[in-house]
Amino acid sequence: VLDNSPYDGKLILDNTSYNKESWVEWGNLEKAEAIPGSLEFLKYASEKGIEIFYISNRYSEQLEATVNNLKKLGFPNAEKSNVLLREDDRSKSDRRKSVSDYYNVIMLIGDNLADFNDEFEVKLAEERTNYTDQMSDSFGTKLIVLPNPNYGDWESNGLFGGKSYSNQEKDSIRKSNINSY
């Protein structure tokens, strides 16, 4: 629900790639904005009596900053007990189970299929496709996939308009569209 695209913009501008140190630094700034529609949707759910949990692969050392960022934006249930961050394992399975052991989980929202089920973790494309087909009835009801603004088909079909560009031209187009901190 937090838009981390300024972090990716910073990586591009600095001509570097993801690393834990810079990721923690970004999270500790508490400057992420809400993904459009996420705040309104979760407030609506909360008003209807739904308990909200935030399961993220931000690192556990970012808990206080993440909770503060969520609170500043007005997200419901933005408490340490409801924000489940990564320890060592990037899999969200144990964190999802810690919620489902005490709550009836009615919906999962994420920008990565592995946010919903470990069957999607590091699988071949064909396996992921088959599993997606098996779960198709859950998409849009129990499983809500958020668009990921940082990478995916949107780049070739959206940003580049389906046209072919050299790597240098692509870099120039990307940089002209960056939102950074």
Regions found by a protein language model. Give the residues of each.
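Alpha-helical substrate-recognition element adjacent to the catalytic core
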Residues: 1-89, 181
